[in-house]
Amino acid sequence: IRWHNKRNEESNKGDKRDESGGRLLKSCLLCDKEFKRSEDFRELILLKTKEEWICKECKEKFEAISDVHCPKCFKDKEEKECKDCKYWSKKGNKVQHEALYRYNEAMKEYFKRYKFEGDRLLGTIFANDIKKAMKKYKSYTILTTPISHEKKEERGFNQVSTILDYGDIKYKNLFKKEDSL
C-alpha cells in the first residue's frame, strides 16, 4: 500500500548505490541523511533482505524496554508491579500493556510526525519489531482501534492499521467510531 504524503510517492525514491555500485544507499526517513543498508550473511544465503528505514544514529535514539520492567504496564526499570498499576488494580481496573520502546523525546517526535503531520511512511519504522513481538499472539484476532472520520480525513490514514499493513500483520476492523455528542 502506497500513499501520497509529504515525503515520497515510493519508499525507494532517492535510493542509490554506493561508489562501488554495490551496497544500496538509503535516505533516513527521520533525518534524511544517507546511510548504507547493513548486510547480513544470513540474508545473502536465504536471499531475504531486511528493509531498513532509518540510519543507525536515529535508531539508537529509540530506547528499547529492558528485561527489567513492570510485568503489567512494561514501565522500564521496575522489578515488580509499579505503583501506578497497583493504584489502578485497587480501583478494579486490569492493566495489561506491552511496550517495545520507552516514550522518550525521539518517540515523541516520531509520533508527532507520524500521527499529527501525516507522514504515513514512518509507519514502516517499527512494523517489523511489532510483527516479531506479535508472534506469541498467533492464535489471537487482532482488532484495530477505529478513528473518527474527521481524523482519518485530516491524517489520510489510520495510524494503527497502517503499521499493521506495513508489517504484513493480519487484523480485523470490527468496530466503527460513532460521532460523540
Predicted features by range, described:
Residues I1-L181:
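Glycine-rich phosphate/pyrophosphate-handling loop used in enzymes and phosphotransfer proteins
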